[in-house]
Amino acid sequence: WIMGHMVNAIAQIDEFVNLGANSIETDVSFDKNANPEYTYHGIPCDCGRTCTKSEKFNDFLQGLQKATTPGDSKYQEKLVLVVFDLKSSSLYDNQASDAGKKLAKSLLQNYWKNGNNGGRAYIVLSIPNLAHYKLITGFKETLKTEGHPELMEKVGYDFSGNDDIDQVAKAYKKAGVTGHVWQSDGITNCLPRGLDRVKQAVANRDSSNGFINKVYYWTVDKRSTTRGALDAGVDGVMTNYPDVIADVLSESAYKSKFRIATYEDNPWETFKN
């Protein structure tokens, strides 16, 4: 999965997919009542990027729905996975459940069109704080009470705080999550970061009793960093330059080992050689 980083304006969806992304990451900011409000990152952000592009969250969802619905004039067949980077650190811990409920309602109405031919992309809820695990339970409960528990088949999870892997496992246990787990590791492109924790995550993914299904590394803009991540065995890389990643994937060392994921590839299944 080539994951376009910080795609917060509707116009950027086409821009990143046309450069080779089959996945995008979108920032979600919340108001003080835990309503998802804008697709917005803010300052500071990655080096070489504008930090302040934004849309109202529900408007973005409607644009995203068009981009991921076959037959729509804006349909982008290659776009199969969306990571919502939930900026829930602005909330109190006891608001996490409400944030999950309100997020589910927004997606149900504006993206899934209440289960009536909505967008088809798989969705990852990426949460920065292990203490906010109730965001997941609130989200799940809401889809159930609204009569669409089947949509949870399209939803996966990530804790993005670079926490100790054992602590991440505990948070999922509390949230009742068994599967659909992506594990991120990374840092802003302005700073270097080693691959030690990525390798730990990959080892968990590949062990018989691991809880991780997929591992991605962020934010990868250089060819050398891309090669390091691929050599470590990641499933995805998040990038400001999808064309750079696509380029490296076409090198002889990688093109026999990796291919770009399509809609037929289940993002919740651990890849077995």
From Swiss-Prot:
InterPro entries attached to this UniProt entry: PLC-like_Pdiesterase_TIM-brl
- CDD domains cross-referenced by the UniProt entry: GDPD_like_SMaseD_PLD (cd08576)
Which keywords has UniProt assigned to this entry?
A: Cytolysis, Dermonecrotic toxin, Disulfide bond, Hemolysis, Lipid degradation, Lipid metabolism, Lyase, Magnesium, Metal-binding, Secreted, Toxin
Q: What class of enzyme is it?
A: lyase
* One example of a Gene Ontology biological process annotation: lipid catabolic process
Q: Where in the cell is it found?
A: Secreted
- Disulfide connectivity? 45-51, 47-190
Tissue expr: Expressed by the venom gland.
Can you state which reaction this protein catalyses? an N-(acyl)-sphingosylphosphocholine = an N-(acyl)-sphingosyl-1,3-cyclic phosphate + choline; an N-(acyl)-sphingosylphosphoethanolamine = an N-(acyl)-sphingosyl-1,3-cyclic phosphate + ethanolamine; a 1-acyl-sn-glycero-3-phosphocholine = a 1-acyl-sn-glycero-2,3-cyclic phosphate + choline; a 1-acyl-sn-glycero-3-phosphoethanolamine = a 1-acyl-sn-glycero-2,3-cyclic phosphate + ethanolamine
* Co-factor remark: Binds 1 Mg(2+) ion per subunit.
The catalytic residues are 5, 41
Q: Which cofactor does it need?
A: Mg(2+)
Q: Where does Mg(2+) bind?
A: 25, 27, 85
Q: Which GO terms describe its molecular function?
A: lyase activity; metal ion binding; phosphoric diester hydrolase activity; toxin activity
What EC number(s) are associated with this protein in UniProt?
Answer: 4.6.1.-
The lineage's top-level taxon is Eukaryota
Asked if the Swiss-Prot or TrEMBL record annotates the protein with the keyword Cell inner membrane, the reply is: no
Which Pfam families does its entry note? GDPD_2
One cellular component GO annotation, for this chain's record? Answer: extracellular region
Which family does this protein fall into?
Answer: Belongs to the arthropod phospholipase D family. Class II subfamily.
Job of this protein:
Dermonecrotic toxins cleave the phosphodiester linkage between the phosphate and headgroup of certain phospholipids (sphingolipid and lysolipid substrates), forming an alcohol (often choline) and a cyclic phosphate. This toxin acts on sphingomyelin (SM). It may also act on ceramide phosphoethanolamine (CPE), lysophosphatidylcholine (LPC) and lysophosphatidylethanolamine (LPE), but not on lysophosphatidylserine (LPS), and lysophosphatidylglycerol (LPG). It acts by transphosphatidylation, releasing exclusively cyclic phosphate products as second products.
Supply the name of the protein.
Dermonecrotic toxin LdSicTox-alphaIB3b
